[in-house]
Amino acid sequence: AFSNVDLVYLACPPSPRKAYALLASAQGKAVFLEKPLGVDVAESRILVRELTAAGVPSAVNFTQAAGRALTNVSEKSKVGALGDLIGVDIIVTYPHWPRAWQQTADWLRFRDEGGMTREVISHFLFLSERILGPLELVWAEPEYPAQGDLCETHVAARLVNGAGLPVMIMGSVGGAQPDRQEVTIKGSKTSRRISEFVIDTMSSGGQFEPSSSDPTDTRATGLQAQLDDLVLLMNGKPNRLATIQEALRVQILIEGILSGQRAN
């Protein structure tokens, strides 16, 4: 069945992902995994080690990785266009979870594998690490429903990078409101806000206004950029996709948040 396959895309729930990925890599196939990398950190460490040893192309689908917004913000921050970096704010709110278009993916409502923290906030922690470098969790406060097998309804957390710059997270579910998904990269001169994954705006102290990034950068354009970089990965060329090592770091942070971990 694998004879004419070059790459296996794994969009299944997290738990079986490791077994499928290793089955594919054992036959020399490249693997493109959905996030999160997994829910068991020990198992994911094994997955990363064995995929690395197999030597097959591998990456994780954090959808902003190759998009114009993250690329532009990263470039601007490196050349000082934002001034001194101050930190990152992540805000995620929903009227219901799972969202209406996810209702058939029933596992997303359960604590074992689902929830907005793994499904959405993980994207923004990946973005934050691309800009600020590796993060450490300082404290986290998740809140779960009385029915203990259901996923979190609220979450707050603080993380810091090596220089002590903070990443603050606030997530909640409930109430009459539209979906809200935004990450704000704060600078002393200019701040950038990415909303709904692709809407890139900027502020120098006033209202956030459209940035100089291409206003036609829709989510479809961002996904096409992912596929373009996937071709680069398959051809052994430099690319912007999330590595399995980056995804493991994000998973460790996410699982720490969901367990209410605090720094010693």
Question: For the regions a protein language model found, what residue spans apply to each?
Answer:
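Beta-loop-alpha module in the N-terminal Rossmann-like domain of NAD(P)-dependent dehydrogenases
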Residues: 1-50
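C-terminal helix-rich "cap/oligomerization" subdomain common to oxidoreductases
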Residues: 7-10, 162, 229-264
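A short helix->loop->beta-strand "cap" motif at the edges of active sites that frequently abuts
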Residues: 27-29, 54-56, 165
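Hydrophobic residues in well-ordered beta-strands that form the structural core
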Residues: 33, 58-60, 169, 194
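Rossmann-fold dehydrogenase core element
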Residues: 46-64, 84-88
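Predominantly a Rossmann-like dinucleotide-binding segment in NAD(P)-dependent oxidoreductases
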Residues: 64-141, 145-148, 264
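Contiguous beta-strand/loop segments that form the cofactor/metal-binding neighborhood of enzyme cores
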Residues: 119, 125-198, 227-237, 256
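Active-site loop of classical SDR/Rossmann-like NAD(P)-dependent oxidoreductases
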Residues: 176, 214-228, 242
